[in-house]
């Protein structure tokens, strides 16, 4: 699990940035925790915003291909396995088949599929994400597409090989490429939902995104509070001990 996600799940500490542990208290059942936070997220658009106030929240709501465990090691998340070509240019990820998208009410919307990663990257490029610099020169064809020299996104080095296999082709070998997959710029998004929300996708409204992670954001009131509840249908729910987290400004 990612460090902040793992800490939320175990209730030991809530990570730096949004989650501050000093003022925390637990209920007698130890499944509800209350803390304070210092800064409101000004967006939930995890694909275009490169700010800690967004990523500290999103990391507990949306999963990517890989994540860091409590020791900083890269471990599987949505990708249950992966391979790297001999020349170090092609990374192929096999997705778990039990990961689902849920709306803010916890209702299942769709399965998480390889095309969601392709859709996410195209959106990142089209919207000129704040975090593009992390990957623009890494993925084959992405720089040309972003600059407008290439109009066909299918020429960019990402593809859904099948429903549960996504593949990235790099411009050069990057031994640290897998670490980049933990950044929300490479997270998936459901295309149908994205289109339905339009410019409202990722606004400061819990219903503006879909969830595939351990928590759902039940409420967010500026300079007041944020409330998270456990996603009861999360594929790794047995490792999430907290049922409810309330952060107070």
What residue spans do the PLM features occupy?
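Sec-exported extracytoplasmic/periplasmic mature domains
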Residues: 66, 70, 97-100, 122-129, ...
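C-terminal motif of bacterial Sec signal peptides marking the signal peptidase cleavage site
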Residues: 19-22
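Bacterial signal peptide processing site
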Residues: 24-26
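Short, well-ordered beta-strand elements
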Residues: 29-39, 90-94, 117-120, 166-167, ...
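Bacterial N-terminal signal peptides that target proteins for export
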Residues: 1-8
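Aromatic- and charge-enriched surface segment that lines or borders ligand/interaction sites
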Residues: 80-131
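Gly/Pro-rich hinge or "lid" segments in bacterial periplasmic/extracellular proteins
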Residues: 153-154, 163-164, 169-240
């Amino acid at each position: 699990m990612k460090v902040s996600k793992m800490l939320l799940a175990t209730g030991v500490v809530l990570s730096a940035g949004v989650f501050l542990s000093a003022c925390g208290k637990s209920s007698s059942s130890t499944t509800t925790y209350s803390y304070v936070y210092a800064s409101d997220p000004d967006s939930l658009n995890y694909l275009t915003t490169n700010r800690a106030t967004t990523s500290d929240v999103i990391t507990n709501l949306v999963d990517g291909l890989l994540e860091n465990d409590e020791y900083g090691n890269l471990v599987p998340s949505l990708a249950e396995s992966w391979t790297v070509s001999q020349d170090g240019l092609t990374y192929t990820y096999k997705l778990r088949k039990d990961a689902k998208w849920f709306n803010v009410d916890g209702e299942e919307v769709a399965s998480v599929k390889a095309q969601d990663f392709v859709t996410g990257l195209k959106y990142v490029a089209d919207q000129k994400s704040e975090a593009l610099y992390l990957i623009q020169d890494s993925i084959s064809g992405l720089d040309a597409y972003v600059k407008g020299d290439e109009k066909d996104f299918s020429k960019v080095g990402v593809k859904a090989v099948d429903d549960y296999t996504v593949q990235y082709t790099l411009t050069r070998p990057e031994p640290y490429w897998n670490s980049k997959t933990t950044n929300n710029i490479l997270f998936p998004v459901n295309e149908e939902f994205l289109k339905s929300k339009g410019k409202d996708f990722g606004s400061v409204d819990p219903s503006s995104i879909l969830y595939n992670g351990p928590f759902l954001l039940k409420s967010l009131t500026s300079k007041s509070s944020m409330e998270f509840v456990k996603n009861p249908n999360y594929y790794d729910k047995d490792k999430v001990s907290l049922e409810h987290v309330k952060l107070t400004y």
